[in-house]
């Protein structure tokens, strides 16, 4: 079965569902400015898979939030995301929880 990435908004939360990887993240990348407008939390609870491209996108989304004047936190961070962040020596501020 082919999976994909989808997202929706609930107030100030961006809910991500599916696979956050290089094969599926282009649509979110293209809509990142609109998707992040007013977002203070990114919920990863619905993510089934993530790769390094997905982690890079998360770092970018957090930075985009900062540029828009909002501190963004991540909710539902999987062990996979934490492991990839540690392997790349990302500071806690890059993927704040």
Give the location of each predicted region.
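STAS-like cytosolic regulatory interaction modules
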Residues: 1-53, 59-97
């Amino acid at each position: 079965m082919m999976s994909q990435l989808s997202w929706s908004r609930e107030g100030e939360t961006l809910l991500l569902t599916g696979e956050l990887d290089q094969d599926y993240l282009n649509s979110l990348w293209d809509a990142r400015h609109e998707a992040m407008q007013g977002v203070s939390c990114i919920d990863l609870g619905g993510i089934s898979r993530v790769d390094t491209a997905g982690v890079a996108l998360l770092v970018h989304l957090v930075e985009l939030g900062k540029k828009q004047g909002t501190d963004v936190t991540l909710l539902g961070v999987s062990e996979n995301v934490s492991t990839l962040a540690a392997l790349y020596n990302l500071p806690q501020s890059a993927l704040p929880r």
